[in-house]
Regions:
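A SIS-like phosphosugar-recognition module
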Residues: 1-149
């Protein structure tokens, strides 16, 4: 859902010059973690379920201990502190439990991906309103036919 949209937005706004990945915290442990290097920016979109967050916190701690990255950004229902972990940016998105009750509570999660895409597009000298130099990507999806069912 949200992580996939953030990854697509970054790739679109950087004209494919920045390649992103998305996964669940558990899924990330099984392979995708191999792409982490000194040029990586990690964005963690954390759950508001405390039982789930235990596993998310463990992965963040493990990555912090074993890797050097450009930055680690955490979006969570409330500001988090993980002892011994240096997080570069913590976005307190909403109150705990709010994601389950309020469909608008996810907006701060999406906004982080939008802002990263926008500023990286500008950093690369692209126009965020029309980042596709080749014209492969447009603001409106084109060429899709709607067929009768």
């Amino acid at each position: 859902g949200i992580a996939e949209e953030c990854h697509l937005k970054l790739q679109e706004l950087t004209d494919g010059l920045v390649v992103c990945k998305f996964d669940s915290f558990l899924g990330f442990r099984h392979g995708p973690k191999a792409v982490i290097n000194k040029d990586t920016v990690l964005v963690y979109l954390c759950s508001d379920d405390e039982k789930v967050f235990h596993y998310e916190r463990d992965l963040i701690r493990q990555i912090n201990e074993n890797n050097k990255v450009v930055a680690q950004i955490v979006v969570s229902p409330s500001g988090i502190v993980i002892p011994g972990v240096n997080l570069d940016c913590v976005v307190a998105a909403t109150n705990p439990g709010e994601l389950q009750k309020n469909e608008y509570a996810c907006i701060p999660y999406v906004l982080v991906g939008q802002l990263l895409g926008y500023f990286k597009s500008e950093n690369l000298g692209l126009n965020p309103d029309e980042p596709s130099v080749s014209g492969n990507i447009s603001r409106v999806v084109e060429g899709v036919k709607i067929y009768d069912l």
